Amino acid sequence: MSHILDTINTVYPFPPKPIPLRDEEKQAYIAEIKQLLIEKDAVLIAHYYTDPEIQALAESTGGFVGDSLEMAKFGNRYPATTLIIAGVRFMGESAKILTPEKRILMPTLEAECSLDLGCPADKFTEFCDAHPDHTVVVYANTSAAVKARADWVVTSSIALEIVEHLDSEGKPIIWGPDRHLGAYIAKKTGADMLLWQGECVVHDEFSADALRKMKALYPDAAILVHPESPASVVELADAVGSTSQLIKAAKTLPQQKMIVATDKGIFFKMQQMVPEKELIEAPTAGAGATCRSCAHCPWMAMNGLQAIAQALREGGKQHEIFVDEALRVKSLIPLNRMLDFAEQLNLKVKGNA
């Protein structure tokens, strides 16, 4: 069973949309970035949810496109001394936690995540302290400070196994921050879980009613859903999983049409894997002016070519990630606990969001 905390009604201030670049401007920035990557001994590492041109640039320059944990692990083993992380801030922190000796740059440190914003370390710590008999399990989409308070850090592809393990030991669990993913895991495992009430602004907008109507238009299509979506949406899915798992499902499922309920940035990599299939954006609760994220993270959209070039060119406090060493060491403990658990299960850990 699970115990639901009171919903935290937070309206997140979205950043302004980036100003579109002309084609000649794009080509000039791409050329500059390629040169700067060489000069700075840097590699570009991008998340699946960044814009397609950023993912393409990462791949064409020998960098990497993946989920948050894959990004951090790639940066850890890649020989470059500077990592430029195109994603949101907790991803840069994760890279610094795993690879403290390298310089970690981001196009902007203002690229937030609603899951991170909705789980402030002081309030979360206060809640955890009020339930000292609970094991604290947090999603990777959290700050270094929240990770440091946790007993376990998990990604969406291994969360079920870890919660099942803890439940088998009779341990009640505090789960944070995503309420939808937490409810999905609680339903699957039957574990005793207290759920922090955060949400991803992108996945929270997907609508079951609208999805049913779309399915009626495409009756032969498979529905792929990220578990950060509401339960009513997850119930309609043919496949539920993390970003990496959804890409794999698109390839393994026999259907030639896929309705995809996650950030539309995933379409770049997914279409690479299944060029012969038709990918369809799942509908959000609103359309046009009435949707907020409109199936694309507004903070991911801040990782533009101009910002990447500026980060490489200038560096400095407005671009570089720093994590207090004591906090880094403490947050590494629950992260390593997950990695060790995955290794024991002989699982390849792939992550979140």
From Swiss-Prot:
Gene3D superfamilies for this protein: NadA-like (3.40.50.10800)
GO terms, biological process: 'de novo' NAD biosynthetic process from L-aspartate
Needed cofactors: [4Fe-4S] cluster
Cofactor binding note of this UniProt entry: Binds 1 [4Fe-4S] cluster per subunit.
Family annotation (Pfam families): NadA
EC number: 2.5.1.72
Molecular function terms from GO: 4 iron, 4 sulfur cluster binding; metal ion binding; quinolinate synthetase A activity
Reactions accelerated catalytically: iminosuccinate + dihydroxyacetone phosphate = quinolinate + phosphate + 2 H2O + H(+)
Residues that, per the record, bind iminosuccinate: 47, 68, 139-141, 156, 226-228, 243
UniProt KW Ligase keyword: no
Keywords: 4Fe-4S, Cytoplasm, Iron, Iron-sulfur, Metal-binding, Pyridine nucleotide biosynthesis, Transferase
PANTHER family membership: QUINOLINATE SYNTHASE, CHLOROPLASTIC, QUINOLINATE SYNTHETASE A
Function: Catalyzes the condensation of iminoaspartate with dihydroxyacetone phosphate to form quinolinate.
Listed HAMAP family: NadA_type1 (MF_00567)
NCBIfam families xrefs: nadA (TIGR00550), PRK09375.1-1 (NF006877), PRK09375.1-2 (NF006878)
Protein name as annotated: Quinolinate synthase
Lineage: Bacteria, Pseudomonadati, Pseudomonadota, Gammaproteobacteria, Vibrionales
